[in-house]
A protein has these predicted regions:
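Transmembrane helical elements of multi-pass membrane transporters/channels
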Residues: 19, 30, 53, 82-86, ...
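Short alpha-helical transmembrane segments in multi-pass integral membrane proteins
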Residues: 1-23, 67-123, 179-244, 286-328
């Protein structure tokens, strides 16, 4: 209700949210386990587990929605069941290995030193994600003010943007992992090379997929809806956000590298100021005077650009500091 969700969809939205949040423990455990595997260079198995869960999710969606006619509840149930499967697979993988990172449930205990390090990096990153999601909720509320058609168009377009983000987020995670590994062994030149290579991959992937989504956006949106009005709204949103999406990739890359070097607080603050601050300013100051979808979503590339400038400056300062430490 606070987000201004239209009356004709609020009950379904509430039902989906309540069921979906039941699966959060599975989602979190999968991410923890997948992070361990990626940290030791195993990126294939987390991907395979996700693919398996995705296939199960798609099949369950068809069964629960089409066969059992469960609607939104069926979609939510399929989602949390697929998250449960991915969680079980990754935990089983960690439990069955003979490597140093083997998960032995009987020996699980909290170690203060490691917990402190995890909190130092994890809490700022978690706060950053939470606050950014808050700004997205404000943007969703602004979209809702256009009615259920615009809301459906945004939801469909956001699914496509989710695929784009997955491609660049994987590069960001790789950058953070490889940077932390090289930082641990004091290989400064390799850290630079990791950042450059990841930047090329991120920009290249986002430009290819972004331009593809821009050109074929209307065709892809037909997967989600047959409504011409909804597709029109979705195309308008994609036309603003897809081509400059490489800015989002660059924006995430520098904080990833900084976290790999153990610096998490400052990137969080800069991301909150650049991304969240800019979007809040845009929504409450600029958007009320120009109430169109275009003027609302142009806040995306504007906030990405502002954040990049601050993150690059921060990275250069930290890089100089780390370089001086390594040369001692």
């Amino acid at each position: 209700e606070l987000m201004g969700t239209p009356d004709d969809v609020i009950n379904l939205s509430t039902l989906y949210m309540r069921i979906y949040f039941l699966g959060m423990p599975f989602f979190m455990l999968y991410n923890y386990g997948a992070a361990v595997l990626r940290a030791v260079g195993d990126t294939k198995r987390p991907l395979m587990f996700l693919i398996a869960a995705g296939i199960i999710n798609a099949c369950l969606n068809m069964v629960l929605v089409i066969v059992f006619n469960l609607g939104v509840a069926g979609v939510a149930i399929a989602t949390i069941f697929s998250q449960f499967i991915s969680c079980v697979l990754v935990l089983r993988c960690l439990n069955k290995t003979d490597a140093s990172y083997q998960l032995r449930f009987s020996k699980l205990k909290i170690k203060g030193y490691y917990l402190k390090q995890i909190f130092q990096v994890g809490i700022p990153a978690g706060i950053q994600s939470t606050v950014i999601n808050f700004s997205n909720a404000l943007l969703q509320s602004s979209v809702n003010s256009f009615g259920s058609t615009a809301m459906a168009g945004y939801t469909a377009a956001n699914n496509i943007l989710g695929f784009l983000y997955a491609s660049i987020n994987s590069v960001t995670q790789a950058c953070m992992s490889f940077t932390s590994q090289n930082y641990g062994v004091r290989k400064f030149k390799r850290m630079d090379k990791v950042l450059i290579d990841c930047a090329i991959l991120s920009v290249g992937a986002s430009l290819v997929f972004g331009c593809g989504a821009y050109i074929f956006g209307d065709k892809v949106l037909m997967i989600y809806t047959n409504s011409e009005d909804v597709i029109k709204c979705g195309v308008e949103i994609l036309s603003i956000t897809t081509v400059p999406y490489f800015l989002c990739g660059i924006m995430d890359l520098f904080p990833g590298a900084l976290r790999g070097m153990g610096y998490s607080l400052v990137p969080m603050i800069l991301s909150v100021i650049g991304t969240v601050g800019m979007r809040i300013f845009w929504i409450f100051v600029i958007f009320p005077n120009h109430r169109t979808l275009y003027d609302l979503f142009i806040s995306y590339p504007a906030s990405w650009t502002a954040t990049i400038i601050m993150q690059v400056i921060c990275f250069l300062v930290v890089r100089r500091k780390v370089h001086s430490q390594i040369n001692k």
